[in-house]
Amino acid sequence: DIGGPTMVRSAAKNYNDVVILSNTKQYEDLTIELNKNKGSTNLKFREKLAEEAFMETAYYESKIFNYFNQKSKNLFPIKNVFSGKLVEKTRYGENPHQKGAIYSQNNKQEIIQISGKQLSYNNYNDLYSALSISKTLPKNKGVAIIKHANPCGVSINPNKIKSFKEALESD
């Protein structure tokens, strides 16, 4: 049986001579490319489409692998595959000279930024540490202050203002 991902991979590996569309969102780009090049496509364009095709098939294969891996309860497979969808590019990575991005395995954006500058990787790391710690506190009764993913101030107090001040003083 040859179909689906096998056909996409076959076309993508022949990008020198083949245009592979793996997503309907690529139709417009193909139309522009064909109009720009009098009915032809250039190699750089075909390479970009091949890369996207391999990304799609790899993502698909990773989902299948993870399904069977979870079903067999294999905690430590010889090889492991992590996949996710881009949530956003961060202001920078762990250090200001690095690039960073946040990916989600469940396709949900779980954090909504209300104001301020774009978050960095470290900001997200601190957020997830704070969420993890706050889950251990009594509901609506505590504050945790986080620096570099480490708790540096914690207070349990039903009065939110007092709890914040106590946590800040314990830093």
What are these regions (language model features)?
Residues 3-6, 128:
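Active-site phosphate/pyrophosphate-handling residues
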Residues 27-33, 37-171:
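Active-site loops and adjacent core secondary-structure elements that bind or stabilize anionic groups
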Residues 6-9, 156:
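Short, flexible micro-motifs
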Residues 2-3, 159:
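Secondary-structure junction/capping motif
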Residues 2, 9, 19-23, 42-43, ...:
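General beta-strand structural signal in soluble alpha/beta enzymes
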Residues 13-29:
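Short, glycine-/small-residue-rich phosphate/pyrophosphate-handling segment
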